[in-house]
Amino acid sequence: MNRPPQDVEFKAGKAKLTGTTVTSDSRKGYLKFGVTPEGLTCVQWRPRDSSAYEDEFYFAPGESKFIKVPACKTGRMYYLNFSGSDQKEFYWLQEANVEGDAKIEKALKVIESYIPDDDDDEEMVVDTPPPTTTIKQEPPKNPTINEVSLSQPKPTTTPPPSATNLDFIKDLFSNLPTQPKQPQITLGKILTAENLIPFLRENPEIKKDLIQYLPEEYQKDENMINEVLHSAQFLQSIETLDYAIHEGHGPEIVSLLGYEPSIASQRGVEGFLTNIQEGTNKKKNNK
């Protein structure tokens, strides 16, 4: 029997094509490729904070194609091609380690080229489903070094719980006190294009200072900074900075920005921004 390949899931965001411009969705998500018991290729996307899939597409065996956008400077923008139509669904990779992109492409090629045997329909009814290959981000040793690995969950032989045990567990958890989950503050929710563009419009001096850090071809047009704020490269940079702060590198980043690190910079994004604000106020008072 031609056994179906493992499912592949990795961090990826959505993007939208408008005319000839691809605009990235700032949300973080997961993109999953797999093969159904019927032999169809299934592609699903969901936000990381939800278990519900927003996108779900099915392809006949051998017809799914996940193609890299050659015009993208970072090389991390892809589109899902639909043969026989002009439809294209765009996604951009959000894994921190760019070098791991090749592993993702290789794993997807296996799924794209999978063609089930004619007798697979009968055997798949009693066959066990393939495990999922999750391409996940391991904690880096420093904010610039990341690792991406393919992990395969081990099969379990634990027998299913009885109905009596399930009822007991439900009763146990129903009596436990619940605590409201505090939303995590991230730079991605603060430094959005929707927030930054009006701010820069009202602060032209800051905008002028930032333009000098753009590529030379962008510096001639001040409005090009708006395009940068919507780009996948900018969103990826914000996500990497977020990760470094949450991994405890806030004091180092504060120091690189020319401010004196405080204990607050070790307390996530909120503490990091508080440290920056305090440093800015201190410099103003010393003038």
UniProtKB/Swiss-Prot annotation:
InterPro entries reported in the protein's UniProt record: DEUBAD_dom, Rpn13/ADRM1, Rpn13/ADRM1_Pru, Rpn13/ADRM1_Pru_sf, RPN13_DEUBAD, RPN13_DEUBAD_sf
One record GO biological process: cellular response to nutrient
Record bears the keyword Cytoplasm: yes
GO cellular component: cytoplasm; nucleus; proteasome complex; proteasome regulatory particle, lid subcomplex
Superkingdom classification of source: Eukaryota
Domain Pru: residue ranges: 2-118
Entry-linked PANTHER family: ADHESION REGULATING MOLECULE 1 110 KDA CELL MEMBRANE GLYCOPROTEIN (PTHR12225), PROTEASOMAL UBIQUITIN RECEPTOR ADRM1 (PTHR12225:SF0)
Protein location: Cytoplasm; Nucleus
Bias (Polar residues) ranges: 143-152
GO MF annotation list: endopeptidase activator activity; proteasome binding
Name under which the protein is recorded: Proteasomal ubiquitin receptor ADRM1 homolog
Keywords: Cytoplasm, Nucleus, Phosphoprotein, Proteasome
Recorded name of the encoding gene: adrm1-1
Organism: Dictyostelium discoideum (Social amoeba)
Lineage, broadest ranks: Eukaryota, Amoebozoa, Evosea, Eumycetozoa, Dictyostelia
Domain DEUBAD residues, every copy: 177-286
